Amino acid sequence: MNNAAQNIIKLEEETPMMQQYITIKKEHPDSILFFRMGDFYEMFNEDAKIASRVLEIALTSRNKNKANPTPMCGIPHHSSKPYIATLIKSGKKVAICEQTEDPKLTKGLVKREVVRVVTPGTILDDNLLDPKQNHFLVSLYSNAKGWGFAALDITTGLFKVTEFYGDDRDLLLKDEIEKFDPKEIILSENLVTGCNKPKWLEDRDNSLQSCEDWTFSFKDSYRLLIEHFKTSSLEGFGCEDMKLAISSAGALIQYLHKTQKSALEPVSYTHLRAHET
């Protein structure tokens, strides 16, 4: 029997609630899934083991009488913020899965969906932020000639883009990264797995996030930017001809839409401008 068939059988053996959990978890394999159950966020399996260790909370299990009980742990939803902060500081991402129906008005399984993914560079809650510091999310894109750089402080809307060319482009980029000190850096999958990634970026492995190569498409990125700023070109922002920087900025926006979902609506990134290094 192949692995796919075994997984189907195992899924069918689970309760409807756990089937729902497993399905949602597959969509967020790199995040700790906070699965809302009543007044608690529950975590299961490997997520539970990691969370219990990082948060120093008790690890229990479901189906204790079975041969392979399911590890689990939980936290009260009304006091989740400090727990989320601790996980983020440890380099984790947290996917918040809420009940999207009123259990009192629903027969059977309550619908649930991930409403937001909290990452080191996309924290919006003032209680989780240092008010004395900027909170930059950076996106990088490269070709054989240069680097595209985009930086956004999601809490203020400050959005800067620039490019680096020439023999010292890697050094210039390194200086810029150190200046902005980003909480998170977005790279294309090709850059993460390829040989073009500068060695010094490896020191920031905990803050690196891999995104699909297509999210760095110049054409799509340009369209995203002019649609958001309601303009026909980017000349007024000083970056019309910055193809690498525009590609970086577009991937950054794609990442925000992917992680913030509805929470992105009140976030302003209206202050786009070419950044002088």
Model regions: which residues?
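Charged catalytic and DNA/RNA-contacting regions of genome-maintenance
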Residues: N2-R273
